[in-house]
Amino acid sequence: MFTVISYLSLLFISFLFALTLFIVLNKIELI
C-alpha cells in the first residue's frame, strides 16, 4: 500500500512540474 501511495504522489508531483513548465513556456512565447 505504501508503494502505491508513494508512486501516486511522485506521479502527481511530476504532473504539476510539467504543467508549470508548460505555463511558463506559454508565457515566454506570449512576450
Swiss-Prot record:
Membrane association type: Single-pass membrane protein
Q: Which InterPro entries match?
A: Cyt_b6/f_cplx_su6
Protein name according to UniProt: Cytochrome b6-f complex subunit 6
Could you name the domain of life of the organism this protein comes from?
Eukaryota
Q: How does it assemble?
A: The 4 large subunits of the cytochrome b6-f complex are cytochrome b6, subunit IV (17 kDa polypeptide, PetD), cytochrome f and the Rieske protein, while the 4 small subunits are PetG, PetL, PetM and PetN. The complex functions as a dimer.
Species for this entry: Chara vulgaris (Common stonewort)
**TM spans (from-to):** 4-24
- Output one GO BP term: photosynthesis
Relate the protein's function as given in its record: Component of the cytochrome b6-f complex, which mediates electron transfer between photosystem II (PSII) and photosystem I (PSI), cyclic electron flow around PSI, and state transitions. PetL is important for photoautotrophic growth as well as for electron transfer efficiency and stability of the cytochrome b6-f complex.
Q: Which family does it belong to?
A: Belongs to the PetL family.
Q: Which GO terms describe its cellular component?
A: chloroplast thylakoid membrane; cytochrome b6f complex
